[in-house]
Amino acid sequence: MGVLSDVADFGKDVIDDRDKWADRFKKVGHFIERNAKGDRLERVAKFGRALGDFSGKFTDFFESNLGKRMVKAARSPILAAGQHVITGMKLTTGVGDPENGRRFGEGADHMSAAGRTLDSAYPTSDWDSAASDAYLSQNNGQVTRAEALVHADQVVAAVLSREAEQIATTREVLDSEADWLGDMSLVTMATGLIPYVGRAAQTAAEIAMVTKAVGASTDQFMMMRDKADENAAEVRDAIGKYEAVAGDADDTTADDTAGDAPESEPTAAEDSSETSKEDGQSRHENPVAAPSGGGGGATSGGGGGAPSSASSAGPAGTPQVPSPPGFGAANTPTDAQPGAAAASDAAGMLGSVMGAMLGPLGGIVGGVVQAAGQALQAATQAGAQAAQLAGQAAAAPDVDRADTDEDTDKDPDAEGDKDSDKRDGEGKEDGTAPRDRESTDAMGADDDDRNAHPQAGSGTDSAGEDDKKPAMTLPPDLQAASALDTGAGSAPVHVGADFEHSQLRTVAAATLDHGIPGSAAARGA
C-alpha cells in the first residue's frame, strides 16, 4: 500500500467518524485541563483548553458548506467499485503462499538416491547363471522406472515453482492498481471541492482512473489464466508418466506370475513318467490280474461320469484305464499316459455338463408329448359319448309312441313285465349308461303310488319338479348332443333295470325330454 493511499484512507475514516473524533478531542482537552495544576503546568492546561475548543470548531467545520463538500468528495463510489473489482481478481489467485513445488523436488532427490542404489546393485562377473540373468532384467526395469519417476517429479516441481512466481507477480500488479486508485482519491477529493464544476470534474476523473486500473488488472489476469492452462497441461503429462510406470510394474508382475507356472508342469510330468516306468517294470516282474467289470474303475452309464478309483486288487500306484461310458471296467491293464488321462477327464466333465443341460429339456419335451396324448384321448372319448347320446335321443320318440299304444290295450302290469325283460336285455347288449338307468328305476320303485298309476306320474320327476325343465345334473359334454335334437314334447319310455345287489326285479318307466338328452323323469310301470 502506498503512503498516499494510507493517508487517504485515514482521512476518509476521520470524515466518516467526525462526531466520534470531536468527542475524543473534547475529552482529552478536559482531562489535561483538570490535571495541569500549578504555575509550571499552566501551558499544559492552556493546551487542554484549546484542544477542547478545537473539538467544537471541528464539529462546526463539517457542518458548514465546505465540510459537507469534503464529506461528499470522500464518499467516492466509483473508486470503491473499481477497487472491489480488482480485489475479486486477486482472490482468484488464492489466499496465502502458493505451492512452490519444494516437496516434489525433495521426492525427486530421494528417488534419485534410490536409483543410484539400484545402479550399483548389478550382478558382477562372479555370478553368471539363469538366476543372475533374471535378476539383471528385473534390476534394469527398476532403474528405468526410478528414472522415469525422478523425471516426472522434477517436471511437477518446476511447473509449481514457476506458477508460484507467476501468482506472486499477478498479485503485486493487482495490489498496485488498487493502491493507485486509493492514492488518486485525495486528488479527486480536492477536485470535488472546487465550486460549481468540482463535482463533475471529480466524477470524470474517477471514471478515467477506474478504467485504466481495471483494464491493466484485466490484462494481467488473462495472462495469468493462459499461463495456468499451460502449467496444467504439463502437469497432466507428468501424471501420464506416473500412470505408465504403474502400468509397467503391473505388467511385469503379471508376466512373472505367468512365467512361473510352466516350470512346474514339466516337473509333474517327469515324476508321472518315472512312476509309470517303475510301475511297468514291477508289472513285468510280478504280473497282476486285471480287475473284472464289477470291481474296477467303471464309469457311470450316463456318459458323463469320471472314472472311479482304482481297484483294491491291484498294487498301489497302478494306473487304471478309464472304460468307455456305459461299459464296465477295462479287461486288460494298460499304462495310462498323462495325455490320455487328461482327455478322458475332459470328456467326462463335458459329458456331465451336457447331461445336466439336456436332462431337463428331455423331461419338458416328454411332458408336452404326454399332455398332448391325454388331450387327444379326452377329445376322442368326448366325441364318441356325444355321438352315442345323440343316437339314443333320435331313436327314443318312435319307441315311446309304440309303447304308449300298446299300453292302452293290454294289461299294464303284464305288459310292463315283458317290456322290463326286453329292455333289460337291450340294455346289456348296448352297454349304455347302466348307472343312469339304475338311478332312474330306483326312483320309480320308491314311489308305489305312481307305479299303480303310470300316467299320473308322467309329468313329474322324483323330486316333484316339472320334467319339461332341464335337469340340474346335466353334464356339460351333452350340450353338443342336445343341439342335434329338434323334436318337441315328451314321450314315455319303458326302461327295465336289473338291480345287481338284490333279487328284486322292478319295471319302471322314464320320460325323456327331446330337447335335452339325458333329462329323465321316472314313473312307475
UniProtKB/Swiss-Prot annotation:
Compositional bias (Gly residues): 292-306
Region: Disordered, residue numbers: 244-341, 375-494
GO CC, any one term: cytoplasm
Pfam families in UniProt: EspA_EspE
Low complexity: compositionally biased ranges: 307-319, 332-341, 375-397
Disulphide-bridged cysteine pairs: none
Name of protein: ESX-1 secretion-associated protein EspE
